[in-house]
Swiss-Prot record:
Located on the platform of the 30S subunit. Keywords: Ribonucleoprotein, Ribosomal protein, RNA-binding, rRNA-binding. The keyword Chloroplast does not apply. Residues 116-137 are annotated as: Disordered. It comes from Methanopyrus kandleri (strain AV19 / DSM 6324 / JCM 9639 / NBRC 100938). Part of the 30S ribosomal subunit. Pfam families: Ribosomal_S11 (PF00411). This is Small ribosomal subunit protein uS11. The gene is rps11. Belongs to the universal ribosomal protein uS11 family. One of its GO terms (biological process) is translation. GO terms for cellular component: ribonucleoprotein complex; ribosome. The keyword rRNA-binding applies. Signal peptide: none annotated. One of its GO terms (molecular function) is rRNA binding.
Length: 137
């Protein structure tokens, strides 16, 4: 019992890290569990100068680190991660920055809970662009 008295149990404050990773950019938003309050919002384009580097893993890593620092200042200690690709008519796989962003969040000191893919998948909604014969290259 004596050893427990010295320890203070720190209450974890959970949030959600929404990572939108396309092949053009990576956007990281950290919100509360309901998604109503935004604690931090960073993108690859905010941390690099060249447009072609917005979607790179390096830009995603820098953006995720800054978002994590900003959220931790506001009291968030742990996050559930929701990864999203463009989906719909676009690619259904996340861009190159998704994995780098998750690793950067963990390295910054945030505890990672669930990792979930929330890419919108059409259940045969509208016709894809390109017409009957498809896109002829």
């Amino acid at each position: 019992m004596a050893e427990k008295e010295g320890k203070k149990e720190k209450k974890e404050r959970w949030g959600i890290a929404h990572i939108y990773a396309s092949f053009n950019n990576t956007i990281i938003t950290i919100t509360d569990l309901t998604g109503a309050e935004t604690f931090a919002r960073w993108s690859g384009g905010m941390v690099v100068d060249a447009d072609r580097e917005e979607s790179s893993p390096y830009a995603a890593m820098k953006a995720a680190r800054r978002a994590a620092e900003e959220a931790m200042e506001k009291g968030i200690t742990a996050v559930h991660v929701k990864v999203r690709a463009p989906g719909g008519h676009g690619p259904k796989t996340p861009g190159p920055g998704a994995q780098a962003a998750i690793r950067a969040l963990a390295r910054a000191g945030l505890k990672i809970g669930r990792i979930e893919d929330v890419t919108p998948i059409p259940h045969d909604g509208t016709r894809r662009p390109g017409g009957k014969r498809g896109r002829r290259v």
